Amino acid sequence: MKRKLFTICLASLQFACAAENLNNKSYEWDIYPVPANAGDGMVWKLHPQSDDFNYIADEKDKGKEFYAKWTDFYHNHWTGPAPTIWQRDHVSVSDGFLKIRASRPEDVPLKKVVSGPNTKELPGTYTGCITSKTRVKYPVYVEAYAKLSNSTMASDVWMLSPDDTQEIDIIEAYGGDRDGGGYGADRLHLSHHIFIRQPFKDYQPKDSGSWYKDDKGTLWRDDFHRVGVFWKDPFTLEYYVDGELVRTISGKDIIDPNNYTGGTGLVKDMDIIINMEDQSWRAVKGLSPTDEELKNVEDHTFLVDWIRVYTLVPEE
């Protein structure tokens, strides 16, 4: 018992030291103030899960710096929404970027893809996924500086509770031109989900604001952009794009109108997940990347320059 207590205390001390060292360093993102208002008497403090990806992590051996913060897979054994098949060796870090690529080898297995009434057998699509070693909870601000892949696949930065029932999407977007009707490279999906797993139910907002499009006609794949969410409390989410507040949702009627949480709202600790997905609902419509498209590795690589996480602490 004493040994277990010592181990817990040591881990807590190491985490505290890491947090202190983190806040004493300078980072690329320092030129961008946190756009969300901390509130009276509170200040933003950088969280150790933040990562500038200024190190090397090879696909086969990612090294200590990567594994100190990330697992190179999903947060359980699920391999992704069919026909997605997440592979550890499709994730790397180099040139200052997290890189998640996609491919389809000749011997890739067929996957049964189901979306609503539609079922197809399609060749799998290999890609990558990483999950944070540390979970976060409101009030927290999470922001990524990323460049979408030029692909029909989804480029994603999101948060998910360990039981897969509460989800906040920071970036979910499709950079390719084959958009399949209104979900193209000029849109960012700024949304959340609340699930009941048995029997399966899924709520997410359906308002037009959840598919954000700016008034400049920006194609989000063309450059890096900062996209962040301030998870303020169980019933308030604020979304920021390049430092500008573009969407706020607040209240039970839009967070959880069906009472799937039993009235609590978004309260569960969440893992941070970064990945690519060949999503089922698009794949059954013919929007999987083709073998020919996948030969262009650059187009099918999601780049993340950095991700930063801030929590609120009392002002000293």
UniProtKB/Swiss-Prot annotation:
Its EC number is 3.2.1.81. This is Beta-agarase. It comes from the Bacteria. The active site is at 167 (nucleophile), 172 (proton donor). It comes from Phocaeicola plebeius (strain DSM 17135 / JCM 12973 / CCUG 54634 / M2). It holds the Pfam family Glyco_hydro_16. It catalyses: Hydrolysis of (1->4)-beta-D-galactosidic linkages in agarose, giving the tetramer as the predominant product. Belongs to the glycosyl hydrolase 16 family. CDD domains: GH16_beta_agarase (cd02178). PANTHER family: GLYCOSIDE HYDROLASE FAMILY 16 PROTEIN, GLYCOSYL HYDROLASE-RELATED. Substrate binds at residues 78, 87-97, 101-103, 197. Residues 27-315 form the GH16 domain. Keywords: Glycosidase, Hydrolase, Signal. GO terms for biological process: carbohydrate metabolic process. Gut bacteria supply the human body with energy from dietary polysaccharides through glycosidases that are absent in the human genome. Beta-agarases, which are active on agarose from marine red algae of the genus Porphyra, are present in marine bacteria. They are absent from metagenome data of gut bacteria, except from the genome of the gut bacterium B.plebeius isolated from Japanese individuals. Residues 1-18 form the signal peptide.
